[in-house]
């Protein structure tokens, strides 16, 4: 809070009864707030992280053959490059990636065989504030995204702009504001506001979504109510030190396309489990539409080689997909010795 000397013309803004009353009320509110023992509830993007990112394998599935070769040149700061070769559905035949990271900076670039370039650059201003940028050129989907994130003692807030522009004589793009507040040591409530306009010939669209997250000792439950009428709920539980399971349910209600009108209901429920062996990780899931998927990651002893096997079977369409990948992480002996005694970096991913 700014301070002014008694001789400053602006001192009257501070030396008055109204300012003193507001300052005392704010300080009392902050002290009362600390007594609740609240902690940071995370962010809106990671509200169902344990289920959707850690347990379920939807984000890990692929079909075909893939080989990844990663070479690390430095650990502090982190600098590595990777080459990916692939044959399969929705996989680029070749992609090159470079990554650089410190406690303050994260930079990553990807270039595929068709010339599509995507970059990410994050900068940490302090322990709680990060600015994130993303750019992609080529592939028919040019995109620019800017995000500023702040993590407080008991809340998180972020502002995001996707393809913002004034070139058409007015503001266009997508703008998103997130806020998640811990209301008890276990419960967090939040909302997300979206404002978007594709062109000046169209009016802007606005939407508000609501979020809730409850975290107990060994289980987490979350709920998301989207502005379009979709409801997503998830439940995650840690069964043992090596086994965790989760269920994710999505229900949406939309106007019917038929002549009679009315509403149509669509929903899907997915159950998944993850088991961590000593040298491998196994994930499996099945959904209410009859699709069974599994993924096995196997590390080959002390060698920096990981084999991944993926498979899914759709019992309704009678279709099956298989995938296999080999990942090799190459580094010099000196880097391996440095890794044993080096402190881990807190990179702002």
Curated annotation (Swiss-Prot):
Keyword Mitochondrion: yes
Gene Ontology molecular function, alphabetical: porin activity; protein transmembrane transporter activity
GO terms classed as biological process: monoatomic ion transport; protein import into mitochondrial matrix; protein insertion into mitochondrial outer membrane
A Gene Ontology term for the protein's cellular component: pore complex
Cellular location(s): Mitochondrion outer membrane
Main subcellular localisation: mitochondrion
Pfam families tied to this protein: Porin_3 (PF01459)
Record keywords: Ion transport, Membrane, Mitochondrion, Mitochondrion outer membrane, Porin, Protein transport, Transmembrane, Transmembrane beta strand, Transport
Membrane topology per record: Multi-pass membrane protein
Protein family: Belongs to the Tom40 family.
Biological role stated in the UniProt entry: Channel-forming protein essential for import of protein precursors into mitochondria.
PANTHER family linked to this entry: MITOCHONDRIAL IMPORT RECEPTOR SUBUNIT TOM40 (PTHR10802)
The protein's assembly and partners: Forms part of the preprotein translocase complex of the outer mitochondrial membrane (TOM complex) which consists of at least 8 different proteins (tom5, tom6, tom7, tom20, tom22, tom37, tom40 and tom70). Interacts with mitochondrial targeting sequences.
Name assigned to this protein: Mitochondrial import receptor subunit tom40
Organism of origin: Neurospora crassa (strain ATCC 24698 / 74-OR23-1A / CBS 708.71 / DSM 1257 / FGSC 987)
Protein encoded by which gene: tom40
């Amino acid at each position: 809070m700014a301070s002014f000397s008694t001789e400053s013309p602006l001192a009257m803004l501070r030396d008055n009864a109204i300012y003193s009353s507001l300052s005392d009320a704010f300080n009392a509110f902050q002290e009362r707030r600390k007594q609740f023992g609240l902690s940071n509830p995370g962010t809106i993007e990671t509200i169902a992280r344990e289920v959707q990112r850690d347990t379920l394998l939807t984000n890990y599935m692929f079909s075909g053959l893939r080989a990844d070769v990663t070479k690390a040149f430095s650990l502090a700061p982190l600098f590595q490059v990777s080459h990916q070769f692939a044959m399969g559905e929705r996989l680029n035949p070749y992609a090159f990636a470079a990554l650089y990271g410190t406690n303050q900076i994260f930079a990553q670039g990807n270039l595929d065989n068709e010339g599509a370039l995507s970059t990410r650059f994050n900068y940490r201003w302090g322990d709680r504030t990060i600015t994130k940028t993303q750019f992609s050129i080529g592939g028919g989907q040019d995109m620019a995204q800017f995000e500023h994130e702040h993590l407080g003692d008991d809340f998180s807030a972020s502002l995001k702009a996707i393809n913002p522009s004034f070139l058409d004589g007015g503001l266009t793009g997508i703008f998103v504001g997130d806020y998640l507040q811990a209301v008890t040591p276990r419960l967090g409530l939040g909302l997300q506001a979206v404002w978007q306009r594709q062109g000046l010939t169209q009016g802007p669209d606005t939407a508000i979504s609501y979020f809730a997250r409850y975290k107990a000792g060994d289980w987490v439950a979350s709920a998301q109510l989207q502005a379009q009428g979709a409801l997503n709920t998830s439940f995650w539980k840690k069964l043992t030190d090596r086994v965790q399971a989760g269920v994710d349910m999505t229900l949406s209600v939309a106007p019917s396309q038929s002549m009679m009108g009315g509403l149509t209901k669509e929903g899907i429920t997915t159950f998944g489990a993850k088991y961590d062996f000593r040298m491998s990780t196994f994930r499996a899931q099945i959904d209410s539409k009859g699709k069974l998927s599994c993924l096995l990651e196997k590390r080959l002893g002390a060698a920096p080689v990981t084999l991944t096997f993926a498979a899914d079977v759709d019992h309704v369409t009678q279709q099956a997909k298989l995938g296999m990948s080999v990942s090799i992480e190459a580094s010099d002996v000196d880097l391996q010795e440095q890794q044993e005694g080096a402190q881990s970096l807190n990179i702002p991913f």
